[in-house]
Amino acid sequence: MEFPEHGVRLLGRLRQQRELGFLCDCTVLVGDARFPAHRAVLAACSVYFHLFYRDQPASSRDTVRLNGDIVTVPAFSRLLDFMYEGRLDLHSLPVEDVLAAASYLHMYDIVKVCKGRLRKKDPDLETRTLGTELPGQTPHPLPSWPPAFCQATPKAKPPSLGVKAVHPLPKFGPPSWQVSEESSGALDLSLKPGPRPEQAHPPCLLQTSQCSSIQQGAQPLVKAEQDSFSEQDSSSPQSADRSPPPVCASAARGLAVNLEPLHIQGTGSQQLGLHAEPVVDSEDLGPGRHLCICPLCCKLFPSTHALQPHLSAHFRERDSVRTRLSPEGAVPTCPLCSKTFSCTYTLKRHERTHSGEKPYTCVQCGKSFQYSHNLSRHAVVHTREKPHACRWCERRFTQSGDLYRHVRKFHYGLVKPLLV
């Protein structure tokens, strides 16, 4: 014999006990706020609390302190009410705060609901999150519960890499993250082969002589990055602390006059050359879209995905002369330190350590770099991208090193099991 109202009645009585402080056996601290609760309810609703009470000794289970930089007091209050009521109230509270708190506590049902709300609230969000995974990695969903807690949980199917639609759904799942700082590397702006979602329109760009005037007349809005590179990547004497604002759609409409359309040959992947100059339709930009500026030649692009192959073409054209072996067939050798190299290109790169040459210069702020990949990493500052996402709290960072330090500071307890 079943009693359908039993679950509702049980939750109601547990809620009354929490409000009265009756039989509450733990206290959750968020900043200066204290939340009395029942361990069994917390562990049943949150993987974070389940792992905490499973791994902590009995003497230290009475108090749980959450990271106040990630979990806000109002957001945790709503999540705690959800645990005892089965209803989630998102009114008068930013969905992003609830999403961050739910991700921190590993409440994946709430994470899914919040992401759905964000998709409905901002349909263009996928254009800003597409391609933000770390190089060489694909996103994969986290399990709803750890294997030790739910042995019979079926394995999640790997995400399909096929093309599903012209505008694919946004990939809100947290990207794979590697603990090693070296493996995370810089943002790779080179064109990668492999399956990619087709775009409704081919990537296109603007070329105009008014680019310099736009930069001179623009008001500074964004503070430039704090230089986290090594000494060999330090800025040249001519450096600016601010970058110009994004070009609005009306300006793009005026810049697109008298430009020739791009003629694309072939039916496979789209190829862009340095001199291909298609017209950017203002309707394609849409409201709130921003143009990206090439840091080498000041050309304008409708998105960072169109900028990537253009930057790659820059570096291929500049370095192609140096990739060949010497015509005499001799082994390339450094005349200063007598080191030998496999080709003249690596020798030229090595010679910069002696000469201090920095041939790659950002046209927006004047900062110079010895290597092209460092300029590519620096370009993210001007495009305002934050491609590196934390898999536990959904916070995003411009540089991979910032993500590494964030994880070491706030999520080290969750990372340690992955290192074993």
UniProtKB/Swiss-Prot annotation:
SMART domains according to UniProt: BTB, ZnF_C2H2
Residues in C2H2-type zinc fingers: 292-314, 332-354, 360-382, 388-411
Molecular function GO labels: DNA binding; DNA-binding transcription factor activity, RNA polymerase II-specific; zinc ion binding
UniProt cross-references to CDD domains, sorted A to Z: BTB_POZ_ZBTB42
Compositional bias segments (type: Low complexity): 227-241
Xref: PROSITE patterns: BTB, ZINC_FINGER_C2H2_1, ZINC_FINGER_C2H2_2
A single Gene Ontology CC term: nucleoplasm
Major subcellular site: cytoplasm
Record-linked Pfam families: BTB (PF00651), zf-C2H2 (PF00096), zf-C2H2_4 (PF13894)
Gene3D superfamilies for this protein: Classic Zinc Finger, Potassium Channel Kv1.1, Chain A
Single GO biological process annotation from the record: negative regulation of transcription by RNA polymerase II
Chain intervals for the UniProt region annotation (Disordered): 174-204, 216-248
Entry keywords, A to Z: Cytoplasm, DNA-binding, Metal-binding, Nucleus, Repeat, Repressor, Transcription, Transcription regulation, Zinc, Zinc-finger
Location(s), subcellular: Cytoplasm; Nucleus, Nucleoplasm
Domain BTB positions: 24-92
Keyword match Acetylation: no
InterPro entries: BTB/POZ_dom, SKP1/BTB/POZ_sf, Znf_C2H2_sf, Znf_C2H2_type
Job of this protein: Transcriptional repressor. Specifically binds DNA and probably acts by recruiting chromatin remodeling multiprotein complexes.
Family: Belongs to the krueppel C2H2-type zinc-finger protein family. ZBTB18 subfamily.
UniProt name for this protein: Zinc finger and BTB domain-containing protein 42
Species this chain originates from: Rattus norvegicus
Phylogenetic lineage: Eukaryota, Metazoa, Chordata, Craniata, Vertebrata
